[in-house]
Each structure stands twice: as C-alpha cells, then as structure tokens.
C-alpha cells in the first residue's frame, strides 16, 4: 500500500516508543492520592494530555499540586522507555525537516522518553505545552505541519489513540496510519501492527502488506 505524502507527523507514546507500563504505574500511584478507585488504564483517555486528565479527575482546588505530582511521577519512570519495532529504522532514514513528533506529553517528559529510547529528536518537536488545546483538538498536528512548512493535507500522521486520530482528522491531515488494534474502528487510512517495514522515499510512503491489520 502506497501514499503520496510530503511530510510525516508521529505521535510518540505507543507509536515510536513504549512507555505504557511506566504510565500505568505512575497514574495508579497518582489515582491513589487524587482519585481513589479510578482505573486510569480503563478510561479510554490514551493520547490526552496529562494536565487535561488531571482537570477531569482531581479536585479543582488541588489542580496545581496534582498536575505537578503526575509530572514528577512520569518523569521518574521515563528512563524505562524503549523504542517500538521499526521506529528507529524509519525515523533514522528520514531527512531532517521532513518529519516531526507531536506528543501530548510536556516537553521535559516527551524529550526524556525520546532520548531514553535512543531516537533522534527532530528540531520541529511539538509537545503538549506548545498548544492551547491538546488532542483530540487539531492544534498539535496543525502546529506540527506548520513547523515543517507544509499543509496538513499533504502529511501523514501515525497514531495509536482515538484522540490522536480525531486530532489529525480535525487538522485536515490527508493520510492517517493507525498503529495497533485500539484504532481499528477509527477514521484511519489503514492500520498496521507496528512501523516495521514502513519506508518513505521521494514523497512515497510504502506500507508493507505483512504489517496491515486494516487497509482501505
């Protein structure tokens, strides 16, 4: 399967890197203090900024301390982040200025996870605190495309979360490649098991049939 695209926009957690277990541990500890009984992993909030989840679940008067607490907990575990299959090979093959990361994590955490996984950090890196509204709002991917000097319609987004897919579509992104079963029913161009085997050359994104979970 092939797509004509001028730029590549990647979500980070669940697409390029695996930080899921660390996030579960951090949020479980956070919930025990600020939202006892809440099962964070069952809330369907993957891809949403931490500060927006804190607003949903912590008492309003405790927002600042609750937000600082989850930021500290997640940063403590950032060093356990590892690359997901195919991520290093793909991004290492891409010319500078042709791709970036659009993560919901704040800048300190996002950079810590990328570096812990051994991935290159693009100059155009977009994080959750760069935008007024996080995913599923279009802001992250609008900013990512803008930093590459591209129209979103000429870009591809790689996403593993419904909130991220909705963000990409709201931004007018032309191609959305879903990663993993969580986005099988989302508005994606195709779904793959991982980035393994995906290539981009001369404006053509090639997705191997062996990795497809869902195609057009």
Identify the role of each PLM range:
Residues 1-6, 106-216:
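Asp-based, Mg2+/Mn2+-dependent phosphohydrolase catalytic module
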Residues 92-98, 149-152:
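Short, surface-exposed connector motifs at secondary-structure boundaries
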């Amino acid at each position: 399967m092939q797509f004509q695209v001028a730029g590549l926009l990647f979500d980070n957690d669940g697409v390029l890197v695996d930080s899921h277990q660390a996030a579960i541990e951090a949020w479980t500890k956070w919930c025990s203090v600020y939202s006892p009984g809440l099962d964070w992993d069952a809330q369907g909030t993957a891809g949403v900024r931490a500060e927006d989840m804190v607003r949903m679940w912590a008492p309003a008067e405790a927002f600042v301390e609750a937000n600082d607490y989850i930021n500290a907990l997640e940063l403590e575990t950032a060093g356990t982040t590892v690359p997901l299959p195919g991520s290093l090979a793909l991004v290492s093959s891409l010319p500078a200025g042709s791709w970036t990361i659009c993560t919901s994590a704040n800048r300190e955490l996002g950079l810590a996870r990328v570096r812990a996984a051994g991935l290159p950090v693009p100059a155009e890196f977009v994080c959750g605190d760069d935008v007024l509204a996080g995913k599923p709002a279009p802001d992250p991917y609008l900013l990512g495309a803008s930093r590459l000097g591209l129209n979103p319609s000429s870009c591809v987004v790689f996403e593993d979360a419904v909130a991220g897919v909705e963000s990409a579509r709201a931004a007018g992104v032309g191609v959305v490649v879903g990663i993993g079963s969580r986005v099988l029913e989302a508005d994606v161009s195709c779904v793959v098991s991982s980035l393994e085997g995906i290539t981009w050359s001369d404006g053509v994104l090639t997705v191997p049939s062996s990795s497809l979970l869902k195609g057009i």
